[in-house]
Amino acid sequence: MALNLQDKQAIVAEVSEVAKGALSAVVADSRGVTVDKMTELRKAGREAGVYMRVVRNTLLRRVVEGTQFECLKDTLTGPTLIAYSMEHPGAAARLFKEFAKANAKFEVKAAAFEGELISAAQIDRLATLPTYDEAIARLMATMKEAAAGKLVRTLAAVRDQKEATAA
């Protein structure tokens, strides 16, 4: 479908605005995936706070220029589906990783997080980042465990001291 200049400018403006507020970006090749499957992916993306769009590579190069996602420029070949994580940095990576397991033709190209390019082979690094709630839960469990351990050591020291004075 031919796009006129105004349409191209509108696409660049829209995606640029989204990119400014995004925490991470993931690019993928969705050739061979059925429309039904893509619709499911888009629905899951909306629920996870992920903005997804198929954008021409020339327009996408303009979008990422001067942003933290500029490192993705070299991966922009062939049909490109870009996903921006808006709420959690690992949301798009997690979504694409799970979708790729179920759909062999779906190929994750790369991801970008804080200006760093993450290859498709290392996408697990980003996909396994804990959410805010998970991180707080882990911290609280660690703190609780440390406090319990300190109490046990203190009680053992008191016991040892009493045994030493009794003997």
UniProtKB/Swiss-Prot annotation:
PANTHER family linked: 39S RIBOSOMAL PROTEIN L10, MITOCHONDRIAL
Family recorded in the similarity comment: Belongs to the universal ribosomal protein uL10 family.
Record bears the keyword RNA-binding: yes
Ribonucleoprotein is among the record's keywords: yes
Record function comment: Forms part of the ribosomal stalk, playing a central role in the interaction of the ribosome with GTP-bound translation factors.
GO biological process: translation
Gene name in the database record: rplJ
Pfam families: Ribosomal_L10
Protein name: Large ribosomal subunit protein uL10
Alphabetized InterPro entries for the sequence: Ribosomal_uL10, Ribosomal_uL10-like_sf, Ribosomal_uL10_bac, Ribosomal_uL10_bac_type, Ribosomal_uL10_CS_bac
HAMAP family membership: Ribosomal_uL10
Subunit: Part of the ribosomal stalk of the 50S ribosomal subunit. The N-terminus interacts with L11 and the large rRNA to form the base of the stalk. The C-terminus forms an elongated spine to which L12 dimers bind in a sequential fashion forming a multimeric L10(L12)X complex.
GO cellular component labels: large ribosomal subunit
UniProt entry keywords in alphabetical sequence: Ribonucleoprotein, Ribosomal protein, RNA-binding, rRNA-binding
Single GO MF descriptor: large ribosomal subunit rRNA binding
